[in-house]
C-alpha cells in the first residue's frame, strides 16, 4: 500500500508543483497519474522514487515512512521514458546488472538464473544475446521493464514508458504491461499524458491539473461521472461540447436550442440550481441526427474514423462535434438536423463545479 499525506513540493523559484496531495493506493493496484504537461504527475513519481525531496508531507509504503530513505532502500523498480540500457551489454547482461552491484549483489550464477526467469515471464528469452542497438523500441522497452522487475521490487514506477513507440506498438505494449503486472501482482504507478493509455490500462486513475488532484477514480467514472468541468473536458475524444446558457424558470436557454430541466433525472442533481448562468456539457455521441430536430445547421467538416464519422458544425458561433455512423453519408455543407439525448447532458456552475 502507498499512502501520500499532505504532500507539497515547492521549487526554489517559488513554483508550487504539488498542493497538499492526499492519495492511497492499494497493494497490487495499477494506478495511472494522468494530466497535462506541468500538472505535477512526474513530480509525484520522482518523490515516490526518492529522486526529489518534498517541501512537506509524508509518503508511506505499507505504513512505514520512506521520506528519509535513499532511493536504493525503497525497494522500487523504475522505468523511464528513455530506456537507459547499457549499449555495450547484451540483454541478459543488462537484466542481470542490478543483481551484480550494490547491496543486492549475488553470485553470477544465481543472478543469471533469476534474470532468465523474468526474461521468460516478459517473453524476451530469444533476445538474450542481442545488444540494444540490434533491437526495436518495443523490444528495448521490454528489456527495461524486465531489468526493473528482476530486483523483485514492491513497487514499479513507470514514467511515460510508451511515448517513444509508434501507435500500434503502444497498443501492444500497454496490453503486455497490464498482463504482466497483474500476473506478478506488483503495485504499479504509471505516468502518462495520454488518456487512452490511462483508460485502457488502469485499475484507477489520478487526474491532475496545476498540482491538484481533480479526481481519483475508476476509469469509467472519469468519463461518465466527472467531478468538474476540467475532468469533463480532459476526458473524452472528441472533447465534450460546451455551451453557456441562461436559466429561466425550469429552462436553460441557448442561442439555438434550450434544455428542459424537467426532463433531467432528479437523482443526478448534486445541488439546487440557484444561479442565472450555467455551462452545459454534451458528449459528441449524444448529439444525434433527427428529423424531429431541436436545431438545424450546416456541416463544416467531416472526419472519417473507421465505422464512425466526426462531424463538425457551428451552433451560433460555438463549434461543436457529433459522432455519426459512416453509413449516414453526411457530407460537408449538408444541412443536418440534430436532437440531444438527455442521458449525455452535464451541468456545471461558471466556476467549473458540476451540479448535474
Give the ranges of each region predicted by the language model:
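Non-catalytic connector elements of ABC transporters
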Residues: 240, 251-356
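Helix-to-loop junction immediately C-terminal to a conserved catalytic motif
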Residues: 49
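The feature captures the beta-strand-to-loop junction immediately N-terminal to the Walker
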Residues: 34-36
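ABC ATPase nucleotide-binding domains
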Residues: 74-77, 81, 85-230
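Short coil-to-beta microelement around the adenine-binding A-loop and adjacent beta1/P-loop entry
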Residues: 14-16
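Conserved ABC transporter NBD signature motif
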Residues: 57-65
Amino acid at each position: 500500500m502507498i499512502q501520500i499525506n499532505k504532500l507539497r513540493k515547492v521549487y526554489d523559484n517559488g513554483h508550487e508543483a504539488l498542493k497538499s496531495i492526499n492519495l492511497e493506493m492499494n497493494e497490487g493496484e495499477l494506478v495511472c497519474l494522468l494530466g497535462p504537461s506541468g500538472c505535477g504527475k512526474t513530480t509525484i513519481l520522482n518523490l515516490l522514487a526518492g529522486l526529489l525531496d518534498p517541501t512537506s508531507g509524508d509518503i508511506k509504503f505499507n505504513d512505514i515512512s520512506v521520506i528519509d530513505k535513499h532511493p536504493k532502500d525503497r525497494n522500487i523498480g523504475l522505468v523511464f521514458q528513455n530506456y537507459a540500457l547499457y549499449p555495450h551489454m547484451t540483454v541478459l547482461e543488462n537484466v542481470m546488472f542490478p543483481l551484480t552491484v550494490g547491496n543486492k549483489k549475488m553470485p553470477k550464477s544465481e543472478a543469471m538464473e533469476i534474470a532468465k526467469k523474468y526474461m521468460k515471464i516478459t517473453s524476451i528469452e530469444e533476445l538474450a544475446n542481442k545488444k540494444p542497438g540490434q533491437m526495436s523500441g518495443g523490444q528495448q522497452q521490454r528489456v527495461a521493464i524486465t531489468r526493473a522487475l528482476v530486483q523483485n521490487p514492491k513497487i514499479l514506477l513507470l514514467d511515460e514508458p510508451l511515448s517513444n513507440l509508434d501507435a500500434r506498438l503502444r497498443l501492444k505494449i500497454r496490453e503486455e504491461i497490464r498482463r504482466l503486472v497483474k500476473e506478478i501482482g506488483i503495485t504499479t504507478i504509471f505516468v502518462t499524458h495520454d488518456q487512452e493509455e490511462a483508460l485502457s490500462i488502469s485499475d484507477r486513475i489520478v487526474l491532475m491539473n496545476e498540482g491538484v488532484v481533480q479526481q481519483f477514480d475508476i476509469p469509467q467514472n472519469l468519463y461518465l461521472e466527472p467531478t468538474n468541468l476540467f475532468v469533463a473536458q480532459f476526458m473524452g475524444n472528441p472533447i465534450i461540447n460546451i455551451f453557456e446558457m441562461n436559466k429561466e424558470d425550469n429552462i436553460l436557454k441557448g442561442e439555438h436550442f434550450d434544455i428542459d430541466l424537467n426532463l433531467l433525472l432528479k437523482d443526478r442533481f448534486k445541488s439546487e440550481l440557484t444561479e442565472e448562468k450555467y455551462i452545459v456539457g454534451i458528449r459528441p455521441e449524444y448529439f444525434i441526427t433527427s428529423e424531429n430536430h431541436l436545431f438545424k445547421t450546416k456541416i463544416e467538416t467531416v472526419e472519417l474514423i473507421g465505422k464512425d464519422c466526426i462531424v463538425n458544425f457551428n451552433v451560433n458561433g460555438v463549434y461543436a462535434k457529433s459522432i455519426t455512423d459512416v453509413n449516414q453519408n453526411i457530407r460537408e455543407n449538408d444541412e443536418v438536423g440534430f436532437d440531444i439525448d438527455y442521458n449525455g447532458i452535464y451541468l456545471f456552475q461558471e466556476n467549473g463545479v458540476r451540479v448535474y
